């Protein structure tokens, strides 16, 4: 298994796009409003996966105490900060320096010690993490196989990986790209439907890196429930993975 390189995973135009959004990342009514709506749903899945993997009490407030967590494509820290509050020693990696600056400032303001790094996951040679997460990221990278391989290298034996990404379906194209950008739910240029991957494709990418996909849940939307975990995979999905 080879490490990814800067030229194979980071798309400069993607890093620049998200870097321009850094100043509004923590504004729930700003350009990242959809992420703020999505984050509680993702966090619910992440917490349940942590408890299932390590047998921790769902009522406990620090189930990751003594564990190292890595979030790749961390943006300004929307996942890193909750992981730190769950007790983890957290490292966040992002390709945009503007995001790392915003993340560091926000964490400092909240009294959280999070190790933020700007760069490409393979080039940073990070290893030994009990939990590796990368949510809504793989659809933005240049070489998906190299990216998954680098995530696998970072994972410690017995560790847990959690990934989420939009599915490549007619429904996701209509709602997540065309409609969402047209009415301003996400900034234009955020999503490129051809880069979305199906669960089957992700399963194959994980297998190529020596990983086995575990739990698979959809993230759906309805007017009554809003965004929620679902058996419907048509829009977005979130998965666990472990070493095969």
Predicted features along the sequence, with ranges:
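Acceptor-substrate binding/catalytic loop of class I
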Residues: 165, 184-201
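Conserved alpha-helix/loop element of class I SAM-dependent methyltransferases that forms part
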Residues: 37-65
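Core SAM-dependent methyltransferase catalytic element
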Residues: 227-244
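Short, flexible, mixed-charge acidic loops at enzyme active sites
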Residues: 172-182
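N-terminal, positively charged/glycine-rich alpha-helical extensions of SAM-dependent methyltransferases
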Residues: 1-32
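Conserved SAM-binding loop
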Residues: 57-62, 67-171, 199-202, 239-243
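Conserved hydrophobic residues forming the short capping helix/wall of the S-adenosyl-L-methionine
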Residues: 50, 54, 107, 206
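Short alpha-helix
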Residues: 194-210, 216
